Amino acid sequence: MEFIVSDISQLSPRPVWAFFDQICAIPHPSYHESQLAQFIIDWAKGRGLAVRQDNAGNLFIRKPATPGMENRKGVVLQAHLDMVPQKNENTDHDFTRDPIRPYVDGEWVTADGTTLGADNGMGMASCLAVLDADDIEHGPLEVLLTTNEEAGMDGAFGLEAGWLTGDILLNTDSEQEGEVYMGCAGGVDASMHFPLERQAIEGDLARFTIGIKGLKGGHSGVDIHTGRANANKLLARFLSHHLDNVDMSLLAIRGGTLRNAIPREAFADIAVPASQKDALAGAVDRFATLLQDELGRLEEQVTLVMESTDNATDPLTRAVQSRLLAALNAAPNGVVRMSDDVPGVVETSLNLGVINTEEDKITALFLIRSLIDSGRENVQSMLQSLASLANVNVEFSGAYPGWKPDPDSEIMHIFRDTYEGIYQRKPDIMVIHAGLECGLFKQPYPNMDMISFGPTIKFPHSPDEKVNIDSVGHYWQQMQAILKAIPVKTA
């Protein structure tokens, strides 16, 4: 399809889309939010708003209540500054330098070959639009914009008591209009390290890159139940199955880019005796047919490629290669258990998100999620057992708590009542199998009442990401209704 530049700033509601258009123009992948943060600081100061930044890089912006609303409970509008940097293989894009190129595609806004950053740029845009507005009724207002949510929740981990004064927090990082979230999964990162040993092999060798491509990928929390294929797991399966009958020697393996994204592509550099390159090609063709038979209805674009490579490094020793591929092939992945308490919601899962070959080791990166601590601990035990069998190390880091639902939440009831008043139907009250920052916010602010909501965003964390235009208008209308309905603060 020919790319057509669209002026999304003219979409309705214009205040939100205009800010989102500006956000798209400023690079802000995880770990590189400083340029966008400085833009927002300068903008807030220009509007006469009080703005501060803490040691974690989080931004805090305050706006006084509108006349007559000074006695209402304080509200914190919250979003995160960073976006997931994912692109198609044939897309030339540097996320640290190049702007996102959004365009209108029917009822949606998407981007040209990259993630759009509607997660959480649309929430950020709505927060700024409220700060900028002179015609929205609200009580004492704060905006909290956190850093590096997508790659470690660094800003949420670094948030300290005393910076916020509000009673209610509205997290804008949910992705289905008409749903409101009152709980989320916790998680922990796992890193499994395979020390490398290499050995030279003699003979006439042919060297190839074998690649899994064309998978849908997606968010390892909200999309994990869909059964979308994991490129790292498929590649490990192929290599393990054909390890002996094609006499492959592994040079390097790589796949995925983020723990919290289902990997769409994975590649292995291998060497085979020149006499066996036809056998390898046959194995590739057979596995490609198998993938189409197994996954074709869900993963219509899945392909297996075989191309020559100039990787001239010595292969791994047979012992290291066998141990590595057996572990990757055996590693659990996907849904581990569905919740008994919340029907239709995943309780526990894990995602083999990244495999990297480094100078002295190969590292596999997982993200474990669970609504309950014991579920997370069970999967950690699985990976510890796998590492023990493979005689390698596994490390766990970055654990963050879940967000326990509060059935008596006042802001939840306000959301429900205002939503029904606007749309004459009930919203869906949800618990999400993904990590929202609210669980971490509860540690320094245990008494803060919280919900999460947002417009409809499909395929976050992938180049197919898109946001529904009409849903942004509904979300904006709902946000204004909530702010107007915030009750008077009592002692």
Predicted regions and their residues:
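Active-site-adjacent substrate-binding region
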Residues: 223, 230-232, 236-253, 405-448
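Zn-dependent metallopeptidase/amidohydrolase metal-coordination segment
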Residues: 8, 13-16, 340, 347-360, ...
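Substrate-recognition/cap regions that form aromatic- and gly/pro-loop-enriched pockets
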Residues: 345-434
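Midchain, well-structured core segments that form catalytic/ion-binding scaffolds
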Residues: 27, 107-110, 150-151, 157-369
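Active-site metal-coordination/substrate-binding segment of hydrolases
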Residues: 69-151, 156-167, 318, 329-333, ...
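Acidic/His- and Gly-rich active-site-bordering loop/insert found
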Residues: 2-108
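His/Asp/Glu-rich mid-to-C-terminal helical/loop segments that flank catalytic regions of hydrolases
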Residues: 228-245, 274-277, 323-329, 337, ...
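Short, conserved charged micro-motifs
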Residues: 70-71, 274-283, 373-379
